Curated annotation (Swiss-Prot):
Location in or out of the cell: Cell membrane
Topological domain spans for side Cytoplasmic: 1-30, 91-93
A single cellular component GO annotation: plasma membrane
Function: Involved in cell division. Plays an important role in septal peptidoglycan synthesis and cell shape morphogenesis. May facilitate the recruitment of the peptidoglycan synthesis machinery to poles and septal zones and coordinate peptidoglycan synthesis at these sites.
Family as reported in the entry's similarity comment: Belongs to the CrgA family.
InterPro entries according to UniProt: CrgA (IPR009619)
Residue ranges, Extracellular side: 52-69
Pfam families recorded: CrgA (PF06781)
Gene that this polypeptide is encoded by: crgA
Identification of the protein by name: Cell division protein CrgA
Topological relation to the membrane, as annotated: Multi-pass membrane protein
Membrane spanning residue stretches: 31-51, 70-90
Subunit structure: Interacts with multiple cell division proteins such as FtsZ, PbpB (PBP3, FtsI), FtsQ, PBPA and CwsA.
Keyword match Transmembrane: yes
């Protein structure tokens, strides 16, 4: 019976081209970005507090009458501001 040839085993080496690129380290976020997401969260909180404390009830000021007419949409608006600010914190370095 003929003998099969033994193949030479090559050592596996990673070529420089096939390596996955490393992430470039980014510096800290700018001041305007931090103030933006903190501001959005605070606007949402203030919106919710003003609606709960001042715009509901028979003694609501006439200046906040438009807010009382929005009704439950005030919760959606306030939470939209807060969630947008929260989502921006995920981009913070």
């Amino acid at each position: 019976m003929p003998k099969s040839k033994v193949r030479k085993k090559n050592d596996f080496t990673v070529s420089a081209v096939s390596r996955t690129p490393m992430k470039v380290k980014v510096g800290p976020s700018s001041v305007w970005f931090v103030s933006l997401f903190i501001g959005l969260m605070l606007i949402g909180l203030i919106w919710l507090m003003v609606f709960q404390l001042a715009a509901i009830g028979s003694q609501a000021p006439t200046a906040l009458n438009w807010m009382a007419q929005l009704g439950p949409w005030n919760y959606a608006i306030a939470f939209a501001f807060m969630i947008t600010g929260l989502l921006l914190t995920m981009r913070w370095h």
